[in-house]
Design a protein with these regions (language model features):
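Zn2+-dependent metallopeptidase catalytic core
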Residues: 24-134, 141-155, 159-169, 399-401
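Zinc-dependent metallopeptidase catalytic helix centered on the HExxH motif
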Residues: 136-212, 216
Length: 469
């Protein structure tokens, strides 16, 4: 009789369990996302099923029915080596946890991260998570044949997502005001997620920091603000400078200790510079001057072929003066790198004159600007005859960088005057010489993702160059 009562109670309890709770009970480390709460993961007819899955110590991988029992046996264009994918995922996990310290173990809930492999020829690569509980990514075969930096990038997004989850575990309110779950304007967008995920992926694939596509875009767009939407996949160089000077934990601290409404660089200022804006611009100019020759330890094995590529455009405005082009004008926190043809000279003097926002462009400057989500030719549809008339008191930092034939760099002192002249004795064996100008307005300017270049804070200027032999 007692046994019957126990069996009846057990059956009653089982009858009240949802598919999610049954699956979680049967599969330790599995958390069933709320959006799939009604799905039976133990049913092979479900879109996602343990009948079509594989797992490693820290990841669960599910694939759609089109792959059948094993994606490795699919048609060549859909074939995926799931063992390789999981092995690489474990390495990317270790990079983010053990080296970058993006999350503490155990992760929220102690659950495994989840990978969902879609049966589609389209390019699908999205990383984030579910329910402020687990990291998850959704991918297609084209992104993992074999698994590489794309998967590292998306797992980087998972750990960005998890910074907020761990803040909640530590008692933070669930108000999307930590872990950069917030944007800097009404559209709730910020470029940090993509910039950061690129840098995180290059930790596993450092040689890919220099690729033709990324570098072509970078050399055209580097003058933009640090979190500009148009360089959201290329503006990762700042994090090399940051972590080289302050350690790898500086990157994860910015994510994990962010506070609304700060952007990443305001968080950096608070954590490391006591909110001193001048100290920030000093650090930023140091970064810009080093970025001109990619003078970062991690970049050293790969940078030689990319020297001498910066080429800011200027237009003559009379009496030897040249005015920076609209398309090369440094935005707030961005920089311009002007190559100087130093042949036969041993000293250069540059007269500098800062201009007000809204000043007239040079006559020959076409004044075209981008309107749209990306800086592509079809989006170059705006036209203006003035620099952007934003409400920002302008400021600058500027100086010289010499790159010698043996790879040595020589840096001048930095100047911050609105108008003045600076000189530099050109070292022997100088191969490339640059005049570098940083946009450093008197008050910090948060960059808003608005898909309209004409709204960006520009710091225009003009220069006159004189040589002595």
């Amino acid at each position: 009789m007692k046994l019957r009562r126990i069996l009846a109670l057990s059956l009653l309890l089982l009858s009240t369990l949802t598919p999610a709770s049954l699956a979680e009970t049967a599969h330790p480390g599995f958390y069933q996302p709320q959006e799939n709460a009604a799905m039976d993961y133990d049913d092979s007819e479900s879109r996602w099923s343990f009948a079509r899955s594989a797992e490693s110590e820290l990841f669960l991988l599910f694939w759609e029915a089109g792959f059948c029992e094993n994606p490795l046996n699919a048609a060549p264009d859909m074939r995926v080596d799931t063992a390789d994918l999981l092995e690489k995922a474990e390495l990317f996990y270790a990079e983010n946890v053990d080296r970058l310290h993006m999350a503490d173990e155990p992760l929220p809930g102690g659950d495994k991260l989840q990978i969902y492999l879609l049966y589609t020829a389209d390019w699908v690569a999205t990383g984030a998570g579910y329910d402020n509980r687990i990291g998850a990514l959704w991918i297609s075969p084209a992104t993992c044949q074999p698994a590489g930096s794309v998967i590292a990038h998306e797992i980087g997004h998972c750990f960005q997502y998890l910074t907020y989850c761990q803040a909640l575990e530590s008692g933070a309110p669930d108000d999307s005001r930590a872990g950069f779950r917030y944007g800097y304007a009404e559209n709730a967008g910020n470029a940090l997620w993509e910039i950061g995920a690129q840098w995180q992926s290059w930790q596993s694939y450092p040689e890919e920091m220099f690729t033709d596509y990324e570098m072509e875009t970078w050399f055209q767009q580097y003058h933009r603000a640090l979190e500009n939407e148009y360089t959201r996949y290329q503006n990762y160089w700042w994090f090399y400078a940051l972590t080289e000077q302050y350690g790898l934990d500086a990157y994860s601290r910015i994510w994990r200790e962010s506070a609304y409404p700060e952007d990443a660089y305001q968080t950096f200022m608070r954590l490391y510079l006591a909110n001193d804006l001048n100290a920030f611009y000093d650090a930023l100019y140091r970064y810009a001057s080093h970025a001109v020759t990619f003078d970062f330890a991690t970049a050293a094995p790969y940078s030689a072929a990319w020297q001498g590529r910066y080429d800011a455009t200027l237009y003559d405005v009379g009496d030897g003066w040249q005015r920076i082009a609209y398309a090369s004008c440094p935005e707030a926190n961005g920089f311009s790198a002007i190559p100087l043809d130093h042949q036969g000279a041993n000293r250069v003097t540059v007269s500098f004159r800062g201009l007000q926002p809204g000043s007239a462009l040079a006559v020959d400057d076409p004044g075209l600007y981008y309107i749209g989500d990306e800086a592509t030719p079809e989006n170059l549809t705006g036209h203006t005859r003035i620099y952007n008339a934003v409400d920002a008191a302008p400021g600058w930092r500027y100086g010289f960088v010499a790159y010698l034939t043996d790879g040595t760099r020589v840096y001048s002192d930095v100047c911050a005057e609105d108008e003045g002249a600076v000189s530099f004795d050109i070292p022997e064996e100088t191969q490339y010489l640059y005049f570098v100008v940083l946009g450093a307005p008197e008050s910090y300017q948060v960059h808003v993702w608005d898909n309209d270049e004409s709204m960006d804070a520009q710091m225009p200027f003009e220069i006159r160059v004189e040589w002595r032999k």
